[in-house]
């Protein structure tokens, strides 16, 4: 969460400096037509967007028999991973727009470890690979010419799989397990709240928080030395914070 706050602070500073620059540029201009073009209508106009930032997934209960055998009952926790998306959209009205985005999650993992009084230990690490395709809609509910606040929602599909690595140390003997689930296609959705402002004619910077649910990975069974090991079924959903640019066409 601290990393997300740092991302938010840096993004806000960047956006504020851009707004100050745009404001100074407008004040120094003697051509009133420049001011009108900066806040001109964008209805029936296309745009491209690029966003990047951080993601923290919700804590989730561990799956599989190994967790029960090792008495792992608490949730496995997420680090702050990278998330980004690109998309193309259309302004239906001045305050209403829609877009189609392709997003990804990288450098993210869920991790848990436990050490026992006798020196034995158990650890697990889940690393997801997520690609999403979402159709989104946004409404500007605060419109101060160059500065806007908007809310949005989107639905689509997420392609989710994960790698799982566990290590079990008992009596000086180390057992490791590595497994990869098959790709699974899930229903995905997002709910978002953000701000944007125009830093140049046809270029808008935005800072967006979103809650995203990508669904669960595929439940998988793998036979190792005659034993069946079950893993997968991890639910990936959580908080996203991204900054980016929107280019009007």
Curated annotation (Swiss-Prot):
One Pfam family, short name: OMP_b-brl
Organism: Rickettsia conorii (strain ATCC VR-613 / Malish 7)
InterPro entries attached to this UniProt entry: OMP/PagP_b-brl, OMP_b-brl
Protein name (Swiss-Prot/TrEMBL): Putative adhesin RC1281
Tagged with keyword DNA damage: no
Role, per record: Adheres to biotinylated epithelial (Vero cell) proteins.
Keywords: Signal
Range of residues in the leader sequence: 1-22
Taxonomy, superkingdom: Bacteria
């Amino acid at each position: 969460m601290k990393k997300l706050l740092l991302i938010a602070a840096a993004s806000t500073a960047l956006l504020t400096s851009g707004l100050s620059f745009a404001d100074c540029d407008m004040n120094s201009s003697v051509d009133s037509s420049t001011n009108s073009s900066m806040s001109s209508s964008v209805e029936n106009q296309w745009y491209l967007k690029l966003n990047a930032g951080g993601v923290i997934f919700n804590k989730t209960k561990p799956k599989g028999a190994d967790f029960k055998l090792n008495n792992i009952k608490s949730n496995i926790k997420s680090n702050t991973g990278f998330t980004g998306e690109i998309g193309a959209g259309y302004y239906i009205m001045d305050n209403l727009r829609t877009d189609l985005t392709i997003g990804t999650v990288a450098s993210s993992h869920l991790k848990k470890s436990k050490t026992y009084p006798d020196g034995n230990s158990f650890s697990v690490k889940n690393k997801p690979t997520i690609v999403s395709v979402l159709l989104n809609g946004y409404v500007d509910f605060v419109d101060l010419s160059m500065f806007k606040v908007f809310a949005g929602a989107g639905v689509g599909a997420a392609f989710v799989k994960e790698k799982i690595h566990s290590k079990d140390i008992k009596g000086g003997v180390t057992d490791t397990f590595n497994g990869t689930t098959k790709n699974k296609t899930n229903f995905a959705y997002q709910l978002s709240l953000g701000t944007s402002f125009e830093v140049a004619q046809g270029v808008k910077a935005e800072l967006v928080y979103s809650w995203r649910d990508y669904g669960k990975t595929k439940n998988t069974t793998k036979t190792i030395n005659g034993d069946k090991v079950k893993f997968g079924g991890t639910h990936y959903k959580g908080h996203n914070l991204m900054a980016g640019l929107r280019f009007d066409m």
